Amino acid sequence: MSRGISTFRNIGISAHIDSGKTTLSERILFYCDRIHAIHEVRGKDGVGATMDNMELERERGITIQSASTQVQWKGHTINVIDTPGHVDFTIEVERSLRVLDGAVLVLCSVAGVQSQSITVDRQLRRYHVPRISFINKCDRTGANPFKVCAQLREKLSLNAHLMQLPIGLEDRLEGVIDLISLKALYFEGESGAHVREAPIPEQYQADVKKYRDELIDAASLFSDELAEAYLEGTETDQLIRAAVRAGTIAEKFVPVFCGSAYKNKGIQPLLDAITYYLPDPTEVTNTALDLDRAEEPVTLSTDADAPVVALGFKLEDGKYGQLTYVRVYQGTIKKGAELFNVRARKKFKVGRLVRMNSNQMEDISEGTPGDIVALFGVDCASGDTFCSGDLNYAMTSMFVPEPVISLSITPKDKRSADQVSKALNRFTKEDPTFRSFVDPESNQTIIQGMGELHLDVYIERMRREYKCEVETGMPQVAYREAISARADFNYTHKKQTGGSGQFGRVAGFIEPIAGQDYEFVDQIKGGVIPNEFIPSCDKGFRTAVKKGTLIGFPIVGVRVTINDGQSHPVDSSDMAFQAAAIGAFREAYNGAKPVVLEPIMRVSVEGPQEFQGSVFGLINQRRGVVVSSADDEQFSRVDAEVPLSEMFGFSTVLRSSTQGKAEYSMEFAKYGKAPQGVTDSLIKEYQEKRKAEQR
């Protein structure tokens, strides 16, 4: 069986928005005979890219959900995940990387390493995913793959080396030179399907020698055999490839390829590179946590006969019902077999088992180690682990960022109200960064997400997929409250209303802590608060920190210590001590010098150098702090930290200030103390809102 697994490659295609990765995926499908005609991304031909199967994606020309597809190339099975390039959809990238064994990092030959490339690089490192890089758009004006390869080394600190040189650039791009086989490759025919090998043109010989020497010199660090052969002048293609493969799998080397997906140049050698240099499932160490042994890490095997361990990494509710995308790590999932959902503690039977090819599906009878398959009708959440037999393993949970923006939505009519709840139920299951709840005070439905575009897409999906019209309020920032000093409390909760009353006294102090939201410390001695009521105190304090009294947002960074108290043999109860804890916290809170924290975003603005001054001005106007800036002959990039509250409508202002030539991305960086003026206006706004609600 391991021979079959060794031909598997699970790869993701990751990049900055508009680097051309969906176009690249489309060409991969075409050359691997998955589709029989090439469609462009923005749907000029009325079809749209195959991998962009959601109607909204085809219209906007951005990839929102990671479509999964399986292709065959020269005896290898490649599972391709096309991931979104927009920061608002980062959870999709995170989820697909969690189940991949390798990645193709796509870069634009003109723009080079951009802000989202840096985010993707950080994610690849987090999940230890080896990568190769493809410098796309070498046919564009200003294309410079040499500069981009240098940026990979300088900006991302990668040991990146060109494996190919372009033959011509911009509108004169003809093909590529393979630095290992020392052949010129030309892509002929209407769709570049025929690859013609030819001798290297004379004018490129000097460059070929220079870059080949650099490549072998770097690769020989991973192979003593290659180092010796190189000194003796007897190096072979096989030795070089083996050394590059070893360095790539160890995440210490990044082979760089170039071409133009749009012009059908360089895709077949990239497919070869995926099979040559990226690991198969047996070459990747995957671990699970044994829940029966205090979450002790366990290394999984790729034995098809072992008990099943699989991860449900994506949920999708399409025209066929709920689909759960699953990566099989160990054992074989068979149709009709019984599996156990470790989180939900429930067994279920595998009904229909399919393989998804974008939005097409094929029925299969089993999924083996290293495979990515989809299950029908399984009630689960994204990130659930499925096991067979007596295994009680959980795959390490995926990192899920907290939402930073919220929006109130109001259905326009009764029918829409019913559909909204269905839509929200589905979306929150599909996407852990999209959340919804009903505000108990205003009774409004609130949705939360990673940015304006993120929420826009879900509102649009409600309209299209559920035919429900909603009115949206102003976007709201997810503020937090915190304390900046220690304060004592000594609070008695006493209620006598005939019959048994309520009594509980708690004393202690609250103080600020760094690095966590809440900590409870029990220093009660002598049983002045009976042991059974200590959890009640903890529960009461947890309730109190859910909503601060300054502006009504959760309180973070608080340690609560209780060291004294009193109980009554009849009147003390769970509810009495919960109420005492809530009262005690509120008593101490104002004395602990509370402050408002606001989310600070990491903002990257990229555009022509001539607009750099305007960009600095826009950031300064928004209370932003420039962290770094870089520029070359044409482009400049400004990295800044800006409060989220100042970023609403930024895209419109940026467009008008830069003639539409600059773009920006942002992601959550940290919480920071809000200036006094901002705090005062938020407090005033909150007090007015409370008064209005009480009328």
Swiss-Prot record:
- This chain's protein is named Elongation factor G 1
Binding-site residues for GTP, renumbered to this chain: 15-22, 82-86, 136-139
- What InterPro entries does the record point to? EFG_II (IPR041095), EFG_III (IPR009022), EFG_III/V (IPR035647), EFG_IV (IPR047872), EFG_V-like (IPR000640), EFTu-like_2 (IPR004161), G_TR_CS (IPR031157), P-loop_NTPase (IPR027417)
Q: Which SUPFAM superfamilies match?
A: EF-G C-terminal domain-like, P-loop containing nucleoside triphosphate hydrolases, Ribosomal protein S5 domain 2-like, Translation proteins
What are the protein's GO molecular function terms?
GTP binding; GTPase activity; translation elongation factor activity
From the UniProt record, report the name of the gene that encodes this protein: fusA
**GO cellular component, as recorded:** cytoplasm
Cited function: Catalyzes the GTP-dependent ribosomal translocation step during translation elongation. During this step, the ribosome changes from the pre-translocational (PRE) to the post-translocational (POST) state as the newly formed A-site-bound peptidyl-tRNA and P-site-bound deacylated tRNA move to the P and E sites, respectively. Catalyzes the coordinated movement of the two tRNA molecules, the mRNA and conformational changes in the ribosome.
| Domain tr-type G per the UniProt entry, residue ranges | 6-282
Q: Which UniProt keywords apply?
A: Cytoplasm, Elongation factor, GTP-binding, Nucleotide-binding, Protein biosynthesis
Native organism is Treponema pallidum (strain Nichols)
Q: Which family does it belong to?
A: Belongs to the TRAFAC class translation factor GTPase superfamily. Classic translation factor GTPase family. EF-G/EF-2 subfamily.
Spell out the Gene3D superfamilies in the cross-references. Answer: 3.30.230.10, 3.30.70.240, Elongation Factor G (Translational Gtpase), domain 3 (3.30.70.870), P-loop containing nucleotide triphosphate hydrolases (3.40.50.300), Translation factors (2.40.30.10)
Q: Does the keyword Methyltransferase apply?
A: no
Location in the cell reads: Cytoplasm
